[in-house]
């Protein structure tokens, strides 16, 4: 494995073990068994490397929780996988929350996260609802709206699970709540 790949693997390990905020360049170099200077050579900065590693990990996480389910159960199945992952992938979700806090002060982090959010919106709309954002301008707007709602729910659910897992909602509670909200939003009252 070359230094670039070693650094990526080391950064992922550090994100899991130490989190985003507590990981130093020395931690990454030690985990990667690579010279300290190779971080700046290959990634320009520790933050750029951590961002790349975190975004890659989050993409893998998103792919896992959005895995296809039987028609009619896609959304509820995804929420079941999200809730399950809140416990099994806690270190990744903590690192993600730490990175979001850093975005306020580092424009490059903000830009990378914003681009990942935009991709996630359309992926969620396509995977869960069959909305193809490339079909028309109307579908692009719909995909953005539907994906944004799912992302808001994932973020809120993650915060609840990180702070108070004992009282955080189950997948079933999320589904029940969404159904009720949908009923209340139905203008026909049906």
List each model region and its residues:
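Short, basic, alpha-helical segments at the C-terminal edge of helix-turn-helix-like DNA-binding modules
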Residues: 55-60
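Solvent-exposed, amphipathic alpha-helical segments
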Residues: 10-17, 64, 95, 99, ...
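Short, solvent-exposed amphipathic helices
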Residues: 112-123
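Hydrophobic/aromatic-rich alpha-helical bundle segments in the mid-to-C-terminal region
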Residues: 109-114, 131-190
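Amphipathic alpha-helical segments used for helix-helix packing
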Residues: 87-114
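Hydrophobic alpha-helical connector segments
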Residues: 48, 52, 63-93, 139-150, ...
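Short, Lys/Arg-enriched anionic-surface-contact patches
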Residues: 2-3
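Helix-turn-helix
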Residues: 6, 10-48, 52
């Amino acid at each position: 494995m070359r230094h670039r790949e070693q650094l990526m693997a080391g950064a992922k390990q550090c994100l899991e073990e130490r989190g985003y905020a507590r990981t130093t360049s020395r931690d990454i170099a030690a985990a990667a068994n690579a010279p300290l200077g190779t971080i700046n050579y290959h990634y320009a900065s520790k933050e750029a490397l951590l961002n790349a590693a975190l975004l890659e990990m989050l993409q893998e996480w998103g792919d896992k929780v959005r895995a296809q389910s039987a028609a009619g159960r896609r959304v509820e199945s995804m929420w079941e996988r999200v809730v399950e992952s809140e416990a099994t992938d806690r270190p990744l979700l903590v690192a993600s929350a730490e990175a979001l806090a850093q975005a306020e002060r580092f424009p490059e982090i903000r830009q990378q996260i914003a681009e990942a959010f935009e991709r996630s919106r359309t992926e969620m709309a396509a995977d869960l609802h069959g909305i193809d954002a490339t079909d028309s301008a109307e579908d692009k707007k719909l995909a953005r709206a539907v994906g944004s709602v799912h992302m808001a729910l994932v973020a809120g659910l993650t915060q609840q699970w990180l702070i108070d897992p004992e009282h955080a909602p189950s997948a079933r509670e999320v589904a029940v709540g969404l159904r009720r909200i949908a009923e209340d939003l139905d203008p026909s009252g049906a």
